[in-house]
Amino acid sequence: MGFGSDLKNSQEAVLKLQDWELRLLETVKKFMALRIKSDKEYAYTLQNLCNQVDKESTVQVNYVSNVSKSWLLMIQQTEQLSRIMKTHAEDLNSGPLHRLTMMIKDKQQVKKSYVGIHQQIEAEMIKVTKTELEKLKSSYRQLIKEMNSAKEKYKEALAKGKETEKAKERYDKATMKLHMLHNQYVLALKGAQLHQSQYYDTTLPLLLDSVQKMQEEMIKALKGIFDDYSQITSLVTEEIVNVHKEIQMSVEQIDPSTEYNNFIDVHRTTAAKEQEIEFDTSLLEENENLQANEIMWNNLTADSLQVMLKTLAEELTQTQQMLLHKEAAVLELEKRIEESFETCEKKSDIVLLLGQKQALEELKQSVQQLRCTEAKCAAQKALLEQKVQENDGKEPPPVVNYEEDARSVTSMERKERLSKFESIRHSIAGIIKSPKSVLGSSTQVCDVISVGERPLAEHDWYHGAIPRIEAQELLKQQGDFLVRESHGKPGEYVLSVYSDGQRRHFIIQFVDNLYRFEGTGFSNIPQLIDHHFNTKQVITKKSGVVLLNPIPKDKKWVLNHEDVSLGELLGKGNFGEVYKGTLKDKTPVAIKTCKEDLPQELKIKFLQEAKILKQYDHPNIVKLIGVCTQRQPVYIIMELVPGGDFLTFLRKRKDELKLKQLVRFSLDVAAGMLYLESKNCIHRDLAARNCLVGENNTLKISDFGMSRQEDGGVYSSSGLKQIPIKWTAPEALNYGRYSSESDVWSFGILLWETFSLGVCPYPGMTNQQAREQVERGYRMSAPQNCPEEVFTIMMKCWDYKPENRPKFNDLHKELTVIKKMIT
């Protein structure tokens, strides 16, 4: 089996094979070039990450930490990995890619040689087997005619007896020519037969076998290139494996049980001597009737002691019940953690248990505090019981002998004594009414304040599912607070408070069907918030946060989900579906929804558009009607713009749109962008697809999902993100620097889209090709039928230096003049 024996008549197939392989090699070459670029960028990114890490922060001056050592080694090994990846990229460029480029040239030469030789031998074969034989046959037929003609003339001459010799000579000559040509034809025919046999049996098979041999040699070479590529790009080479081994070894050296031994040794302090708490005997210097550490039982205190004893007994019982409940909760949580630990598939899954473990430790602290309270109550109760039992059945002795005192004082003094007695009696009465205040009980009195049955969403301080950042911006003074639904965990509620210069966020716990922070539980969130607001009870003892000023939501923009009816699906956006809908008053609207399973940062970006649009009111900016953030999913309600997106509009109506209308569209966008520029708003995604066509063909700028409002008019973005490359200015692509000037560049691209009637910019180029061409100075040519004045504006917008681009005010003026010029 081979080319020579099986592909004698498959010239077209061989050529197609060579063409296909050349295209394949070009694809491989392009792939390798992109891989080299990708690896270089990856190496640069790794190095950049390491440079951004403050290595000094990982070094403790007086504390040896294995975690710190491990982290520092991770950074060092990541730098090493960066160097390895860079070296690999360079080796890939100088090795496989260079050889592949040479191989492509050689393969092109092989094809060229094959085509040339095949054409040559095929032409020779046709010449020998067809062309020359046809010439001989044609001459053969002619000479037969000439011979027959000479023969007839010779016969006529014989019959007439005239010029016989001359006619005979002509006849002999014609016969000789024919016989000689006959011999030539016989020889040529023999040669043609042999040539054809040689062509099909030897010459052509030899050529095809030669091609096959070179094809196979190139496959062998390509295999070698692939092998080099595989080895160079392998992520399991010894040097890369060693990097990860070093990291793994450093991680394994982390021992949680000994991590803080050195820290303890360095910062160890001697135990402070406990302060002795004793009765201050100086209090008794002016009174002889009271005794240190003795409960006074007399006619003034007997009743109150009974009440205090009863209260302490109740408190002790309540504390013991709570203690049993907490201890059971500790055991239950320990069991749950143990079960969860057994199901962990990865070591890092332990992170998922940290919250439960922290809750367990807090429970244990609560148990210890309750035990302390139990011991304190038991000791106080025992002291009271001892005194009461000692005097059981006895009549309480009087404190003061009034008859004796009456003989030694005046009537005025008696009144003063009686007044003092009354004050003492009233004080004791106060003690009897609130014995816990005397005993310093740690148990809190559950004082539930009725707040009605209004749903949570109807309370002004409830802001729904607004982002954490937006909530923080609303909190400005001590005690400012609001409640919101967690963005990251729908269904979980958070109290956000400004306290002591910080914005604090407390998750509202829901346990045993009660809402609480760490104290009293309530059946709903409004009761919980109202209790802490009215009583000024701290949210947690550790934080000491007190609620002072409820921050009301902006009712102008807030709508309830029930106020909106969803209609037909209009399309899908970056964050979720977009629906047509109506408000209660039948106003048609567009409803943007946010998927509930989106990452937290994308949900924040979703609401960023509404936050920006709240501030704007302009006929060429799409209007915000409101937001529904009271529950998930979150909605943004916009005005319904009936004409749809501008890009689709251009493509559908391209045959009927006049030049003046296109200039009007451009003027509308310029007016809208001029307004945004005055508000220091950077759109960052200006394009035909992000504009909407309203009534009377008024164009409105939409889709502010990437927009930013910056006081300085410049926004810096870092990180790898999906950006509209063909619409984005070079400085934004290269350095993440966005400004009104970068919006002007995008406006120039939008102008090109408008006057090309919806053609994609940089036609025939990929994003990367367009980016590279722009860097080299390339700019798109004018669309067909585009006015020269408009194309001049485009070129101004595409100036490489941002400071040289026109302002939107200038663009608006120039387009106004152009509009007047066009009839």
Swiss-Prot record:
Keyword Transmembrane in annotation: no
GO-annotated molecular function: ATP binding; epidermal growth factor receptor binding; lipid binding; non-membrane spanning protein tyrosine kinase activity; protein kinase activity; protein phosphatase 1 binding
Record-listed E.C. numbers: 2.7.10.2
Pfam families linked: FCH (PF00611), PK_Tyr_Ser-Thr (PF07714), SH2 (PF00017)
Residue numbers carrying Phosphotyrosine: 402, 616, 715
Induction description: Up-regulated by insulin in myogenic cells (in vitro).
Domain called F-BAR: residue spans: 1-259
Activity regulation summary: Activated by phosphatidic acid binding. Activated by hydrogen peroxide (in vitro). Activated by reactive oxygen species (ROS).
Region Disordered, residue ranges: 389-408
Reactions the enzyme catalyzes: L-tyrosyl-[protein] + ATP = O-phospho-L-tyrosyl-[protein] + ADP + H(+)
One annotated GO biological process: regulation of epidermal growth factor receptor signaling pathway
Binding residue positions for ATP: 570-578, 592
Changes after translation: Autophosphorylated.
This protein's domain notes: The coiled coil domains mediate homooligomerization and are required for location at microtubules. The N-terminal region including the first coiled coil domain mediates interaction with phosphoinositide-containing membranes.
Family, per entry: Belongs to the protein kinase superfamily. Tyr protein kinase family. Fes/fps subfamily.
Function: Tyrosine-protein kinase that acts downstream of cell surface receptors for growth factors and plays a role in the regulation of the actin cytoskeleton, microtubule assembly, lamellipodia formation, cell adhesion, cell migration and chemotaxis. Acts downstream of EGFR, KIT, PDGFRA and PDGFRB. Acts downstream of EGFR to promote activation of NF-kappa-B and cell proliferation. May play a role in the regulation of the mitotic cell cycle. Plays a role in the insulin receptor signaling pathway and in activation of phosphatidylinositol 3-kinase.
Official protein name in the record: Tyrosine-protein kinase Fer
Source organism of this protein record: Mus musculus (Mouse)
